[in-house]
Amino acid sequence: FFDDNLAEKIRTEKLLENNFQQALENNEFVLYYQPKYGIKGAEPELHGAEALIRWISPEYGFLSPGRFIPLFERDGNLEILDRHVLKLACRQLRQWLDAGYKAVPISVNISRRNIVGGNNFLAYALDVLAEYQIPINLIQLEILETDASVDSKLLIRFLQIFKSSGFSLAMDDFGSGYSSLGMFNSMPIDCLKLDKSFFDSWQPDMSERDSCLIKYMIKAAHDTGRTVVAEGIEEKFQVDLLRQYDCDMIQGYYFSKPLPAEEFASKMHKRV
C-alpha cells in the first residue's frame, strides 16, 4: 500500500514537471492577490498585496504552490516561473490602471537563484515594466528565505544592484529559513516580512514575555529604516498586539484570503 502511494506520488510529480511548458502556453498559471493592510490608522487601510501563483490544471484541478514549487526548484523551472509571475502581475496592474483604479504596490516572490543567476533577471524585469508602462514603485520583489545554496555575500551584492535600479525589496518568510538577524542587518532590503510560524503559538492570555521577540524585531527593523509585515495573521488579538508593537502591515486570513484579480480589484479605490 505504501509503495503504491509512493509510486503514484512520483508519477504525479513527473507528470507535473513534464507539463510545465504546456501549462505556461495554455495560461494554466493564474495569480491570486492577498491584501496587505496598514494598521497604524484608526481603520485598516489597503497598502498592497502579494501575488501568489496557482496552477489550474485540466488533469489535477486547482493546485496550490506547495504541490509544484518544490518540483520546479529541483528542475530549474522556478526561474522561468518567476519571470512568468512578474509578467502576469505587470499585465494585471496595467489593466487596473487603464480601468481607472488607484493601484497599490504588488509584491512578487523571486528565488535567490534568480537574483544571482546568469540569466539577467534584472534586465528582464526592467523590460517587462517598460513594456506595460508600470511605475517601478508599484512592484516589490520579495526574496524567498528558503534557499541556502546561494552565497549570502553574492546575494547582497546583487540585491544592491536591484535596489540601485529602483526596486523595493522585501525579505519574505523571515524566521522560517536560513537568514540571521545579522544577515538581515546587512541586506539592502526595505521590508521585513515576519513568518507565520512566529504567531502560530500566540494565545490571547499569553504573557508579554511570549511575544517580546516580535516586539524587539519590529523595533530593530524600524530603527534601521525598514517596514514590517506580519504574515499569517488570523485572530483579532494578534492584530491588537501587533498594533501595540507598532507593526506596519498585516497579511493574513483575519483580513482576507488570497483573492482572484476581480475580487481584489473591488477593494481598490477608483481614481476620481
PLM features per residue range, with description:
Residues F2-L71, N109, M171, Q251, ...:
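Active-site core of bacterial EAL-family cyclic-dinucleotide phosphodiesterase domains
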Residues D3, K9, G38-E50, I56, ...:
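Catalytic core of bacterial c-di-GMP phosphodiesterases, primarily the EAL and HD-GYP domains
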Residues E8, I56-E59, S111-V116, L138-S152, ...:
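EAL-family c-di-GMP phosphodiesterase catalytic domain
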Residues T12, L16, S64, F121, ...:
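Helical mechanochemical/support elements of P-loop NTPase systems and associated helical scaffolds
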Residues L16, L78-D82, D210:
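Hydrophobic (often cysteine-bearing) scaffold residues that line and stabilize catalytic clefts
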Residues L16-N19, A51, R67, L71-F72, ...:
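Structural preference for long, well-ordered alpha-helical segments in enzyme cores
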Residues I69-P70, E79, I156, Q160, ...:
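Conserved long alpha-helical elements within nucleotide-processing catalytic cores of c-di-GMP signaling
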